[in-house]
Amino acid sequence: INKNNIFYSMIIKNLKKNNRLDETELFGPILNVQKFKDVEKLKKELNSNNYGLSCIIWCSNKKNSEKFINNLRYGRVWVNGNITQNYPQIPIGGFNWSGIGRETGKSAIYNYSEFQSTIINKI
């Protein structure tokens, strides 16, 4: 493996807005930490991203976290948890460029199904 392809575990914080890291779908041990004051402004910034596979939120106030995740465009959101908490009954899949369809959970069955709608009018 080329050394340039290896990401060592890292925590990145206080990045300036519109940086490359925020506009890339990363798979690896990289944590981008951002503090925020305005929940709606941060949600708008996150939803403007082209990717939406997963998001982890750490918040000391339950009401703030519930307010934050409402209408957030990510396929899976953890609040005060991490990606090692997986439940097979919950669908996995992303929004935007992060994938089409869902894996695991009941909704995954729809990927292997064909539906037909039939409308019968009275005679």
Model-derived regions, located:
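Conserved C-terminal structural/oligomerization subdomain of aldehyde/semialdehyde dehydrogenase
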Residues: 7-123
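Short, solvent-exposed loop/turn elements at beta->coil junctions and helix N-caps
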Residues: 1-2, 82
